[in-house]
Structure formats: C-alpha cells, structure tokens
C-alpha cells in the first residue's frame, strides 16, 4: 500500500510571504506550485521549483482563478473557454521555469474555487481536463475523490490522482464542507490522524453528519501554514509509516 503527501506551495508574491515552504518540503512527496494568478510570481516560481527539485519532490502546477485579493477562493462567473485558457496560460508559465531548472511538471492540481467548481460542474471539469490534456497528455490531474473532475479527466484518457484531505470535514455527498462554515477544518490532531488512516486503509470517510462514504485515496493534501503545521505533517508521516504504508510521489 502506498500514498502520496502533497502540499500547496510557492504562494508568496511581491513583498508578501506565506507558510514555511523550506521546512515543509522535506516532509512531502508532491508540491503544488502556484502559477501567478491566485498567488505566486515569477521570482517565487523560480525559487520554489529549485527548492522542490533539490529535495527530490514531485513538481505540480497549481493553477487558480485570477483573484489575488481573494486568494483564488471566491467563485467567479467564468466560461469554460476562459477556464481552458487560464489553465493553459499558467501551465505554460510554470513549465518555462521547469525548463530553466532542467526538470518537468509531473501533475496538475487546480486551486481553491477552481478546484471546487471543477468538482461540481461538468463543463468546468471538462475545460480543466481538456486544457491539461492538450498541454501535455502525460500529466496527472489531481482532483477531489469521487467527483466530476476525476471522471472527466479519465474520459479523456488522462491519468488521475484522487485526493483526500487530512484536516477537512466532508459533506454527505463527498464534497468538502465549505470553509465558510465554522467546523470545516479539523483542528484536533488525533481526529485528523484517525481520518487519514480510515481514508487510506479502508477507503472510507465519515461525513460531518456521521455518514460513512466510500472514496479512493491516491494522495493526501496537507497544509504547510499554521502554528502546528510541521508537527502535524510529521505525525501523519509517522502514523502512516507505522501502518506499513509507503509514502511515495505520484
């Protein structure tokens, strides 16, 4: 049994810095690097790719909606064509810096609102998947387990990775509880660790209402920001290793 640990990185821009990328990178196996629309800029992309490559971590593009002020977490009234083009644009930007560092993109994971819109809207899911396929059909598309983004990508012949979340609660339909709700994020470490093991070993998760949901877990999203982020990720790694689960990149 194996699992990937992924984290969203490179989300600083200009004079603004977020999270502790230097500390979290050695603990993960895949990095989702912001491409300049919701966060990140040309200097941050350059530095982050170098850091990720030097640590032997898989490089992923993390395209988002063009919304710096909202950190890409606000829905936008945007057409599938616009979605397609903004994904291609951001992949091209990150790919350029990968070429400079003599490495390549391994996977793509949409960010924030784009991720959630793709999970629920078939047309948007198809636009994201088509953009990835047309850019490089060998890339892996990461999406929320059991959602439209995964099925649309697979219908095109793309490889996919079904993602689960260590510290997020789930609705009865398998969607993530909105961050607007007070209980969306699991703050108790033991509860989060128990959820991780259930998802990875049993392929199940218990919703906020107590319903047991089947899911597939190829990769676990962990977060590098917050006061106890590093300790939390270390505990996840330790728990998985004790259960005999290999932690490997996609």
Swiss-Prot record:
Lineage: Bacteria, Bacillati, Bacillota, Bacilli, Bacillales
Assembly description: Forms a complex composed of PxpA, PxpB and PxpC.
Keywords linked to the UniProt accession: ATP-binding, Hydrolase, Nucleotide-binding
Protein's name according to its UniProt entry: 5-oxoprolinase subunit A
Source species: Staphylococcus haemolyticus (strain JCSC1435)
E.C. code: 3.5.2.9
Similarity comment text for this entry: Belongs to the LamB/PxpA family.
SUPFAM superfamilies: Glycoside hydrolase/deacetylase
InterPro entries xref list: Glyco_hydro/deAcase_b/a-brl (IPR011330), LamB/YcsF/PxpA-like (IPR005501)
